[in-house]
């Protein structure tokens, strides 16, 4: 069986590597991928994510059994609909189902309609009305661009002035283009955040281990928001009862609601949750695997990944098993300056061997050379599975200390929250 993974980052590297390790899978193509993936025997296809017709033509020519769609913008642009219209299978939600991610206002409407716990909110396209709402509610308060903004469209404002400025940047200054033409303004929720992922087909879903991401650029959760600087799974200090509550009060009603709305969901659903004094509440939905969480969740899967996905798509009950001991922890290495301006072309250390997996996010071969250079904001991620968070930290940070990371940076405190508890 030949498979296609659409996307280019560390998430897609982890998905493609796991698929290639499955029985019955002979070849995995990644479009467009990045050069670091070739070190794991993956085949790159020079077609960008937005070129749906070229991807479909490639899939037909190469007798691809099905495609796994990685990035949010492809799903929001209807790539799954296009594959299905061409008679091809793709694992991911249709454009209508993916609206859970590409419109925060739509997600809020679904949650309100199906009684799913989330923050109180208002949606505005008029700046003066948004400003009046902010002044009425007070701070802290959260301002979100309605559409996709590369994970950077959320401002947690400590003051009313900050919130008004964020709303102005989105609504008047066009900071995120059409994505910020509407804003969702939410009450600030206090508590610890965690991620819950599920494989989904309609109202059938299969929960994955919990994960905790680290969004801020620098140690101590300082600095700007990023796509994510590291993660670990499972979250050892999170009681199973909280997960069970989240499944019954959030995941199940949302998926049943989507079926009732005529938008049945197929693919991976990410639920960003916060554990408040009133129990778990939804911060956001993503209509696909998270990055970097994929890179620490998939190494824990002990069943046949390709078979699992194939079964889920066919409506067959999958046999999914997970490693149930130890902790998988990963640290992202990014270009200095990320998530703002950064340089490309920094030489990268050699790929790790043994127990530490290297997933590449932004890597490119130097011309006529096997030397990998940085080619993005997040560059690579080191991942290991150990008995504890502490043991995972020791392993990864010892390895990083031995690598030449000139021109790159990483956080030194990934997993600390689990140790403090």
UniProtKB/Swiss-Prot annotation:
Q: Name one GO biological process term.
A: purine nucleobase biosynthetic process
EC code(s) of this entry: 6.3.4.13
The catalytic activity, as recorded, is: 5-phospho-beta-D-ribosylamine + glycine + ATP = N(1)-(5-phospho-beta-D-ribosyl)glycinamide + ADP + phosphate + H(+)
Query: What family is this?
Result: Belongs to the GARS family.
Q: Recite the UniProt keywords alphabetically.
A: ATP-binding, Ligase, Magnesium, Manganese, Metal-binding, Nucleotide-binding, Purine biosynthesis
Name the chain's protein: Phosphoribosylamine--glycine ligase
GO terms assigned for molecular function = ATP binding; metal ion binding; phosphoribosylamine-glycine ligase activity
InterPro entries hit by this protein: ATP-grasp, ATP_grasp_subdomain_1, PreATP-grasp_dom_sf, PRibGlycinamid_synth_ATP-grasp, PRibGlycinamide_synth, PRibGlycinamide_synth_C-dom, PRibGlycinamide_synth_C_sf, PRibGlycinamide_synth_CS
Describe how the cofactor binds: Binds 1 Mg(2+) or Mn(2+) ion per subunit.
Query: What cofactor requirement does the entry state?
Result: Mg(2+); Mn(2+)
Which positions in this protein are listed as binding Mg(2+)? Answer: 284, 286
Q: Enumerate the SMART domains for this protein.
A: GARS_A, GARS_C
Give the source's domain of life in one word: Bacteria
**Its gene?**
purD
Q: What pathway does the annotation place this protein in?
A: Purine metabolism; IMP biosynthesis via de novo pathway; N(1)-(5-phospho-D-ribosyl)glycinamide from 5-phospho-alpha-D-ribose 1-diphosphate: step 2/2
Pfam family, any one: GARS_C
User: Where, in this chain's numbering, is ATP bound?
Assistant: 134-195
Q: Which HAMAP family match?
A: GARS
Residue intervals of the ATP-grasp domain = 108-314
